[in-house]
Amino acid sequence: MKKSTLALVVMGIVASASVQAAEIYNKDGNKLDVYGKVKAMHYMSDNASKDGDQSYIRFGFKGETQINDQLTGYGRWEAEFAGNKAESDTAQQKTRLAFAGLKYKDLGSFDYGRNLGALYDVEAWTDMFPEFGGDSSAQTDNFMTKRASGLATYRNTDFFGVIDGLNLTLQYQGKNENRDVKKQNGDGFGTSLTYDFGGSDFAISGAYTNSDRTNEQNLQSRGTGKRAEAWATGLKYDANNIYLATFYSETRKMTPITGGFANKTQNFEAVAQYQFDFGLRPSLGYVLSKGKDIEGIGDEDLVNYIDVGATYYFNKNMSAFVDYKINQLDSDNKLNINNDDIVAVGMTYQF
C-alpha cells in the first residue's frame, strides 16, 4: 500500500525537529531560515513539583552565507521561553543552542559555541518519546552528553565523500567552572561515528568522551576522581512506517546524584513506534540507568521507567499527544529519587 502524503510528511518531521523551518531570506548566496514551536502541555502527577502547566515556546534561526564555491559560513541560535511562569519571574528564557562555523565541501564543517555533545549523536536515536525519554545518560550541561557550552566541533559526512553514510564527529570542550558544581566540566574531548551502510534502513553508532573534572567536583562526597568518561553504542531501524532504536552506554564519575556523582552507571534505552497513514503515531519505550558502587549505598537505580504514548498529527504543523511515564523506581530507594508516575497531555504547533 502506498504511504499517504500525511504519513510521509510526519516521518520527515520526526526525522528532523527543524524540518518545518520557514525561509525568510535567500539572495546573493545568503540564506536565513526561522523555525519554532509552541507546546501547550500539562503534567498530572502525585509529585507536586511535576504537576501542572509545563507549556513553553521554542524559537530559532539558521543562517548560511556562500563565501565561494567551496566554502560556506553558517550559524544557528535556538532559545526556549517558559509559558508557565509569572511575568515577574526572571527565569523565563534559556539559550539552547548558539554556534557559528565554516563548512568546506567534502572536508567537513567546524564550529564553536553552545551545541550538542558527541555522545548525543548516539543517544538522540532513542530520544523520541512524545514528551519524556532520552534521560538515562544524557543531561543538559553534563560534560558532552547533551547540549553544552564551549564546544568546538568538527563534523564530516560520508567520510570525505569516500564512504556513503559514514559520519564522523570530533569534539573538544573547554572547561566551565563558574556554575553549579554538577554542571561544571574540565577540558575534554569526544568523538562519534554513525554508519547507515550507504543509505540502508539500518544504522549503527558509537561515541566516546573523556574530560577533566574540576577541583570543586572532587570535593564532593561521592564520585571523586580526575577524569569523567563515557561511551555509548546504538542501533536504529527506520523504514516502512516503523521506527526502532536502542542504545547502551556507560559513564564514570560523570552522572550527577545526591552528594556528587555516580562512580559508574550502566544505561539502556529502547523505543518502538509506528506511523499510521492517517496521522497516529503510537510509541512504546523503556529507560534504565543503574548507578554502581555508590559510596554508602552500593548499586541503585537512578532512572527506571516504561513509557507508553501516542502523537496524532493533524497536518505538518499541528499535533496532539499523550505520554505516560510509568515509574519503576522503588519507593524506598536509597537516594530518595521521586518514584511517582507522570502523565503528559498537550498540543504542539510548529513551523
Curated annotation (Swiss-Prot):
Induction: By phosphate starvation. GO terms for biological process: monoatomic ion transmembrane transport. Pfam families: Porin_1 (PF00267). SUPFAM superfamilies: Porins (SSF56935). The keyword Transmembrane applies. Residues 1-21 form the signal peptide. It is found in: Cell outer membrane. One of its GO terms (cellular component) is pore complex. Gene3D superfamilies: Porin. It is a multi-pass membrane protein. Coiled coil: none annotated. Keywords: Cell outer membrane, Ion transport, Membrane, Porin, Signal, Stress response, Transmembrane, Transmembrane beta strand, Transport. One of its GO terms (molecular function) is porin activity. Uptake of inorganic phosphate, phosphorylated compounds, and some other negatively charged solutes. Belongs to the Gram-negative porin family. Homotrimer. Forms mixed heterotrimers with OmpC and with OmpF; other mixed heterotrimers are also probable. This is Outer membrane porin PhoE. It comes from Escherichia coli (strain K12).
